[in-house]
Design a protein with these regions (language model features):
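A short beta-loop-alpha structural element at the N-terminal edge
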Residues: 2-17
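Hydrophobic alpha-helical core bundles mediating ligand binding, dimerization, or RNAP-core interactions
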Residues: 17-22, 36, 126, 147
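Conserved GNAT acetyl-CoA-binding A-motif
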Residues: 97-98, 119, 126-139
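C-terminal "cap" of GNAT-fold acetyltransferases
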Residues: 141, 149-151, 156-187
Length: 187
């Protein structure tokens, strides 16, 4: 049963994403579903999700943020739980400062190559746009391991018990492409 990218997400999908996040993170690290939905509703490139047999299998939030928010994230002084629509930058505001807010695959759908599929779909809208860099804020050891596998550099601990990572956009794209040419592990 292959995973398929969901062409148009609904508020219910965002509620399902929030429920999936709660399996891994405390609520203090999660942007409420209604707020994430508001980003997507105005900026549909901000979130990509996939399903298997009608069940949410995973998702990625990758989107441009205002330069001041990027710097606050980078410095470890902004918890994206408090991210609001006004913090998301329109893709016309270039160059783009990207934030990889979350990438999560449900445990039962791991080892299917879904991370690669989600990242490829998430990168597509930005392919021809000038992006400066990408920052991520990792709450778990698995998140830190993901960031390191994908070539991010650990910058510092945040003021909200997480780790901040960053890399150039060009490097991130190359690392995603490199990892996408490696076949998924056998089950």
């Amino acid at each position: 049963m292959p995973a398929t990218i969901i062409p148009r997400l609904t508020l219910q999908h965002f509620r399902d994403m929030e429920a999936l996040e709660l399996q891994f993170y405390d609520a203090e690290f999660i942007t409420p579903a209604e707020e994430s939905w508001s980003w997507y509703d105005l900026h549909p490139h901000s979130t990509v999700a996939a399903e298997v047999d009608g069940k949410l299998a995973g998702f990625v939030n990758l989107f441009p943020v205002q330069p001041a928010i990027y710097e606050a994230l980078r410095s470890g002084q902004f918890n994206d739980h408090f991210m609001e629509l006004e913090h998301v930058a329109p893709i016309t505001q270039q160059p783009l400062h990207m934030f990889l807010s979350c990438i999560l695959v449900d445990r039962q759908f791991r080892r299917m190559g879904l991370t690669r599929q989600l990242l490829q779909a998430a990168l597509r809208p930005y392919a021809a746009l000038p992006c400066v860099g990408v920052v991520t804020d990792n709450v778990t050891a698995d998140g830190c391991a993901f960031s390191e596998r994908y070539g991010f550099t650990r910058l510092r601990p945040s003021d909200h018990d997480s780790w901040i990572y960053e890399q150039s956009w060009e490097s991130f794209v190359k690392n995603c492409e490199r990892r996408s040419t490696t076949p998924p592990p056998a089950n």
